[in-house]
Amino acid sequence: LAQGRPISGHVAFLGGPLHFLPELRKRFIETLKLDDEHVVKVDYGNYFVAMGAALSDEAEVIDVARLEQSIAKAKEAAARETRKADFTLFEDRADYEAFKARHDKDKVRRGDLSAYRGPVYIGIDAGSTTTKITAIGKDKEILYTSYGSNQGSPLKTVVKEMKGLYAALPEGTHIAGAMTTGYGEAIVKAALHADGGEVETFAHLRAAQEFCPDVTFVLDIGGQDMKCFFVKDGSIGNITLNEACSAGCGSFIQNFAEGLHMTPAEFAAKAIDSKAPVDLGTRCTVFMNSKVKQAQKEGADVADISAGIAFSVIKNALFKVMQLKDVRELGDHIVVQGGTFYNDAVLRCMEKLLDRDVIRPDIAGLMGAYGAAILAMEAAEEAGMQQSSLLSPDELDHFSVATSSYRCRGCGNKCLITMQKFPDGGKYFTGNRCERGIGGQKKDSDTPNIYQYKYERLFKY
């Protein structure tokens, strides 16, 4: 905010956050190195701007009637801004049932794991907020699935879920291939000795092709990310991601639901009965909170607000993230996936805005893991591999991670590198900007560094 200019003299801390959060004021004072003499103590910092407006020489004297008229005009303007959307999700219950019946056809083949015999292929999708595991058989049928929250530790979650999978495997089965994908693809592959790792966009595309071989466009909306990719001749031609922030994704809907003391599923179900969805626009979701409150003041019920939020999520994806100009750019075969599309209202808004039907697989939230499992099977068959290198149940029982940090001295950046060491001696590094700090480009030197030796001899334990 200072833009390089020094902050000096007597400083007053104004506004709600600095008024109600004393620790925030304290951190500012420490950072600016202010003493008590130069800190202006303000009793009503949260009202300071309003007080200044009241004391201004430019303030006008108006009567109560004129004030009431101005307030009424402001309310009318707010009401026009929070206008109703120009469509309803479903005309009646029969329309919704027909919608459900159409999408219930997009189902993956499933098999009975307890009765299955033969090779099993594993796909692990370590996402930003959830971990998904899918096991498939030799005919690409799903035998086992797992879907759960990372709880801040994706690696521990994967180990836990893999133990559950091993416990469910009957005699006569063996894991012939395993592949990882998602945010945690690299570390999970290194830790569990998976046979391979794949970028999540390719995993999602491979899964989408099982439902629609001629797919032309895939939209994946997860908990905190959004991926849109165009497909041409079976390959990805262009990719768009929500790089700036995670607003407008699944966690956005979940937060609103929790604010109303409802589960996301209950909140989504309310939207089905909406007859006049509230148009909340596509602005930042922080500002959208105020528009929701305004809609509530005007009498909008939960159903209309839920439908309006679903409408905003899709508008954000199509017109803000993708900056779509012409619907024809998407082609005729559209597949949507990600846990957010379990919400029927979001799916219906997608179809309404595009004015065409789309395909939502019944495993929309597992598509990354399913695609990784298929890729694992294809890689194993191509290599003639019969047994995966994945850690065994006994090795998982004794699995642990030792974490340490050190400064790289390969160049002036002096990167702070975090090393995670596994029981078998394997290592995984993060924080490095190049390969020097992890042993990739060591320089031979005949001269020993006695100070470095002394430091490591004393403290590297």
Q: Can you say where each PLM-predicted feature lies in the sequence?
A:
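Phosphate/ATP-binding catalytic cores across multiple sugar-kinase/actin-like superfamilies
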Residues: 1-7, 101-110, 308-331
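Conserved phosphate-binding catalytic cores of ATP/NTP-utilizing and phosphoryl-transfer enzymes
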Residues: 2-3, 50-55, 101-117, 185-222, ...
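Conserved phosphate-binding/catalytic loops in two-lobed NTP-binding clefts
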Residues: 14, 29-51, 195-201, 351-370
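Glycine-rich phosphate-binding/hydrolytic loop that grips phosphoryl groups
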Residues: 41-77, 206, 253, 362-390
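Glycine-rich phosphate-binding loop plus the immediately following alpha-helix
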Residues: 46-59, 145-155, 233-276, 374-378, ...
